[in-house]
Swiss-Prot record:
One of its GO terms (biological process) is isopentenyl diphosphate biosynthetic process, methylerythritol 4-phosphate pathway involved in terpenoid biosynthetic process. Pathway: Isoprenoid biosynthesis; isopentenyl diphosphate biosynthesis via DXP pathway; isopentenyl diphosphate from 1-deoxy-D-xylulose 5-phosphate: step 1/6. Mn(2+) binds at residues 162, 164, 233. The gene is dxr. Keywords: Isoprene biosynthesis, Manganese, Metal-binding, NADP, Oxidoreductase. NADPH binds at residues 25-28, 53, 136, 138, 217. Catalyzes the NADPH-dependent rearrangement and reduction of 1-deoxy-D-xylulose-5-phosphate (DXP) to 2-C-methyl-D-erythritol 4-phosphate (MEP). Its cofactor is Mg(2+); Mn(2+). Its EC number is 1.1.1.267. InterPro entries: DXP_reductoisomerase, DXP_reductoisomerase_C, DXP_reductoisomerase_N, DXPR_C, DXPR_C_sf, NAD(P)-bd_dom_sf. It comes from the Bacteria. This is 1-deoxy-D-xylulose 5-phosphate reductoisomerase.
Length: 407
């Protein structure tokens, strides 16, 4: 049994639904809170969390009358305590408080804590059989098989909140899983879609941050420029929908209007289209199994004029090829892929390596991991976190060598 519902057969819940938002002050959290703001009376906020943004968290807690708030950074305890004095809102700090927020009774939970820190809170929600809008990549990239199996056993419902996976989720409801022949994830191509390899190699931070279509955080925008983000999405799709690498294709689609397609055995292809606005997939998750009104712009195909598609260039964007390699190697390798990329992106932002060295550091770390024979299956969250930690250390140790080769 899959934790992702491939048929819209869940009964509609009557009355006010309670919601928890993990990562409420981040970009995904901000979009989620905006949707909740427009649907007052339909939802009640149980808990909100943030990393260190006390002011933003307290402002949201007061606005939505949250019952509990949590900060990951323990150094802000006194500031949080003082800001909530007299409100009656419960609060806590540290990992245990974030897990408590996820464990509290809520009908629906947005899992948008970034990084490996989001894994244990998401598992806490899974274990109580919650409906989870999943926006944390690490739950799938670092612990996908384990996470999805645990969700299925607990009766949790996992709804993909990322635009591409939500598109596949919607399209898959048009047929049965055994009728699927492949899924197609689209990619904008990022700011370097038409650049020569030599120019991509030496791209600056400012150039990498100029995404043509989406407004996103700094890290994910750089990942889009390298197509590392699309590689991560390939891995996520495999975990969410129990797909083999050969069942997942990527097409470059510069307009970012078609977000995903599913091909069935009769060669019918069902696509999901929409303006590039993260509030659309989040609204789909928030309203599911119904649909709620969303604030995104109407899709005007006449003004867009044309939709074009290109095959991805694995030579100019090796990060995408590496994702398929890691997926075929196994769960530990996908964890290494993600961890090494985070080290590489941080080094690029700090101007320690060229843009083109991001993928080279990831490849070197993957090769080193495989040579060391570190291929045991992951059986727990602690296993995944340990692999993530060790892979980061390996990538950091390889960084000077990669930087020297590029200089």
């Amino acid at each position: 049994m899959s934790a992702v519902p491939l048929k819209n057969d869940k009964p509609v819940e009557a009355g006010v639904r309670t919601v928890t938002v993990l990562g409420a002050t981040g970009s995904i959290g901000d979009s989620t809170m905006d949707l909740l703001r427009g649907a007052r009376g339909r939802y009640r906020v149980e808990a909100l969390t943030a990393n260190s943004n006390v002011e933003g968290l307290v402002k949201l807690a007061r606005e939505f009358d949250a019952r509990f708030v949590a900060l990951a950074d323990t150094s802000y305890f006194d500031e949080l305590k003082n800001a909530l004095a007299g409100t009656g809102i419960e609060y806590g700090v540290g990992e245990s408080a974030i897990i408590e927020a996820a464990s509290r009774p809520a009908d629906w939970l947005m899992a948008a804590v970034s990084g490996a820190a989001g894994l244990k809170p998401a598992l806490a929600a899974v274990d109580r059989g919650a409906t989870i809008a999943l926006a944390n990549k690490e739950c799938l990239v670092c612990a996908g098989d384990f996470f999805m199996q645990r969700a299925a056993r607990a009766g949790a419902c996992v709804l993909p909140a990322d635009s591409e996976h939500n598109a596949l989720f919607q399209a898959l409801s048009s047929g049965n899983r055994d009728e699927l022949t492949r899924v197609i994830i689209t990619a904008s191509g990022g700011p370097f879609r038409t650049w020569a390899a030599a120019d991509i190699e030496n791209a600056t931070l400012a150039q990498a941050l100029k995404h043509p279509n989406w407004s996103m955080g700094r890290k994910i925008t750089i990942d889009s420029a390298s197509m590392m983000n699309k590689g991560l999405e390939v891995i996520e799709a495999a975990c969410l929908f129990a797909l083999e690498p050969e069942e997942i294709d990527v097409l470059v689609h510069p307009q970012s209007i078609v977000h995903g397609m599913v091909e069935f055995s009769d060669r019918s292809v069902v696509a999901q289209l929409g303006a590039p606005d993260m509030r659309t997939p989040i609204a789909h998750c928030l309203g599911w199994p119904e649909r709620i009104a969303g604030p995104a712009a109407k899709l005007d195909l006449v003004s867009i004029g044309q939709l074009t598609f290109e095959a991805p260039d694995f030579a100019r964007f090796p990060a995408l090829r590496l994702a398929y390699d890691a997926l075929r190697t196994g769960q530990g390798a996908t964890t290494v892929y993600n961890a090494a990329n985070e080290i590489a992106v941080a080094a690029f932002i700090a101007e320690k390596i060229r843009f083109g060295a991001i993928a080279r550091l990831v490849e070197a770390t993957l090769n080193g991991w495989v040579r060391a024979g570190n291929l045991a299956p992951l059986a727990s969250a602690d296993d995944a976190i340990a692999v993530d930690h060790n892979a980061r250390n390996m990538a950091a140790s390889l960084l000077p060598q990669i930087a020297a080769k590029a200089s």
